[in-house]
């Protein structure tokens, strides 16, 4: 329950933020709340079953990711969802959950150097296929999160450091080449981040409106439903990518600090759990699972808040427990319930 309480209060911040800017989303947000909380306690009760059968869930969602790539619902040029009529299922969000368990299993297998090298190759091939499919949706944000989770778990694994070092060097050498595979709008977002004044009404519009929203909130905010930038729709994606700006505009600097404190509590409890497993050599897999969960929440939080503050490029990464959306909201609570 230590993990649930900070997440619960963060989700309340998200609920009231959405309520203040989009009354039309109240019913669906309430439905996601009920579904997420029910799923948390259900998965928590049968957590051992889900952890033992992670492989089935991982490969099932992996298959759904491939299906999404072929026949997924296309919105604004992106094909990221499967339409289940009552729910748009974003397979990449749920795959992140079981990807952590996949990596923890394969990266903690003991054996000779050659066996560990084989395990590393298996892990990286699976990782590259997943990132390729997500990148082609296109969903740069989730591709980045998968990459960061993989890197952090790899650094904390039993894989020989020489193998890891060579991989990181190769990755950095190839990184500049990714520029040529980015969509035009993704390149424009990076350029707008480097020079926000280049196009006020175009590529820089989102960042500028987000900064204005954050600044206009003052210390205690404009009040619930009184955020002019967010409620009057000057701020695009005010309930998803830029919900932190909407939150600060309504609840002010004080509200923003409270959100950071709640995240801090969540990371404190997660770190405490990781250190507990670290002290026990037989718990290396559970240690790596918790490290992956920390990376999952931490990087999404940092990147989302960073792009809302104008200090990171816009990548479409949502804020855990706060941003509106069923798949991300539900998968985050399921992941909490699966903590060993």
What are these regions (language model features)?
Residues 192, 196-240, 251-255:
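TM-adjacent membrane-interface loops and short helices in multi-pass inner/ER membrane proteins
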Residues 139-144, 222-227, 238-240, 257, ...:
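Transmembrane helix boundary and interhelical junction motifs in multipass membrane proteins
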Residues 4-203, 245-309, 334:
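Hydrophobic alpha-helical transmembrane segments of multi-pass inner membrane proteins, especially
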Residues 18, 299-340:
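A juxtamembrane structural motif centered on a specific transmembrane helix
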Residues 94, 219, 329:
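Residue-level recognition of oxygen-bearing side chains
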